């Protein structure tokens, strides 16, 4: 500003700037070069070059990536190969997980994961030493590559407990901790594992200052929070919510295990506890299906022209910003910087949205 320049729109993240500049939403048609094709990739994408892991990793790094990402496909393209397309129901993959832990010392006794891929569910009941349980869960995440990760109250219990236990097992080495909690959709490489400024490496789940968990490339979607927002239940326990949704279906209710005496239950009937864990893993998937939570997030992203991640985890202001900034750009109106970032500027005077009423207005 001392030279007579006023900088605007300078604090919009590049990934958002791409959507804004090209007027893209969550549904995109793209054309480019296939760098990697995994087992689940379309057959026409598979060649000796695209299925060779070492060669694919080298090609991804040459294109600007950090290594071989745990994805079905990696495609390189430039902005000329991107365009908005008509909305379609994306074939999202969802993984639900649950932990059963010791009351005495907080250790993980057993776990379960269920992956829903197009309506077909694969169960992973997991037992063994605590390190083996965490490693197996991470293997499931990186092999099955889910878009959404759910469970019941994972924001406040399961994810914090896994972070705590992984740090207790490997307190001094991020590289040793990565196989225990490397859930991010990034390569398990040194650059992705090392700590950033005031935050863990990109490969690890991270709880932001607003208490929301982020997992790079994936979307945590707590079924507890979705039920709370949509149903407004009198009580928020999984037992109560499942009976509220399916009052006459015993198969959809929690099993009779006393979680307050989990050490005793695990010692006397471990098979029943594991079955209880699997049931508690399946119910969040059923809750999300019943509430149409994922379809709602995708529809919101399509209308607001944001990523599904922002539609699922962010606030009303981000959705409205996506539309208003495009309008400002079309009309030649400068968008001032906010007071965020390393060099805070003057605060923007204005209003904020209390509530958005659904409906169509003329």
Regions found by a protein language model. Give the residues of each.
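Acidic beta-strand-to-loop metal/phosphate-binding motif
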Residues: 1, 146-155
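N-terminal accessory regions of nucleic-acid-interacting proteins
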Residues: 1-88
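Common nucleic-acid-contacting/processivity interface regions adjacent to the catalytic cores
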Residues: 26, 32, 36-57, 260-362
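Extended, Lys/Arg-enriched charged tracts that mediate electrostatic binding to polyanionic substrates
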Residues: 60-62, 66-91, 95-97, 188-213, ...
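Conserved RNase H-like, two-metal-ion catalytic cores of nucleic-acid enzymes
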Residues: 68-150, 169, 185, 347-359
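A short acidic (Asp/Glu
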Residues: 106-108, 154, 159-165
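Active-site-proximal helix-loop-helix substrate-binding element of RNase H-like nuclease domains
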Residues: 121, 145, 149, 159, ...
């Amino acid at each position: 500003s001392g030279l007579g320049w006023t900088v605007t729109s300078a604090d919009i993240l590049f990934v958002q700037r791409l959507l804004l500049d090209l007027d893209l939403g969550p549904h995109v048609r793209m054309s480019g070069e296939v760098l990697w094709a995994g087992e689940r990739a379309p057959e026409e994408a598979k060649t000796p070059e695209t299925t060779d892991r070492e060669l694919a990793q080298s090609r991804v790094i040459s294109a600007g990536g950090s290594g071989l990402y745990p994805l079905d496909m990696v495609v390189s393209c430039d902005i000329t190969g991107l365009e908005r397309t008509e909305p379609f129901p994306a074939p999202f993959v969802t993984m639900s997980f649950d932990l059963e832990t010791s009351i005495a010392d907080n250790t993980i006794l057993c776990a379960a994961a269920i992956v829903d891929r197009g309506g077909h569910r694969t169960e992973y009941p997991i037992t063994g030493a605590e390190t083996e349980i965490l490693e197996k869960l991470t293997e499931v995440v990186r092999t099955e590559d889910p878009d959404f990760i759910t469970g019941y109250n994972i924001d406040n219990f399961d994810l914090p407990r896994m972070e705590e236990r992984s740090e207790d097992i490997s307190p001094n080495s991020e590289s040793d901790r990565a196989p225990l909690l490397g859930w991010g959709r990034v390569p398990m490489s040194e650059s992705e594992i090392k700590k950033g400024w005031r935050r863990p490496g990109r490969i690890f789940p991270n709880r932001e200052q607003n208490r929301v968990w982020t997992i790079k490339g994936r979307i945590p979607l707590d079924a507890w929070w979705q039920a709370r927002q949509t149903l407004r239940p009198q009580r928020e326990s999984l037992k109560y919510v499942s009976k509220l949704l399916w009052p006459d279906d015993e198969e959809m209710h929690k099993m009779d295990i006393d979680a307050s005496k989990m050490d005793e239950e695990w010692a006397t009937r471990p098979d029943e506890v594991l079955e209880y864990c699997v049931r508690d893993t399946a119910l969040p998937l059923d809750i999300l299906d019943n509430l149409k939570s994922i379809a709602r997030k995708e529809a919101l992203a399509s209308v607001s022209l944001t990523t599904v991640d922002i539609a699922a985890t962010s606030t009303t202001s981000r959705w409205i910003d996506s539309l208003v900034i495009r309008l400002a750009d079309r009309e030649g109106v400068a968008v001032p910087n906010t007071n965020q970032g390393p060099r805070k500027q003057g605060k923007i005077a204005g209003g904020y949205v209390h509530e958005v009423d659904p409906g169509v207005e003329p």
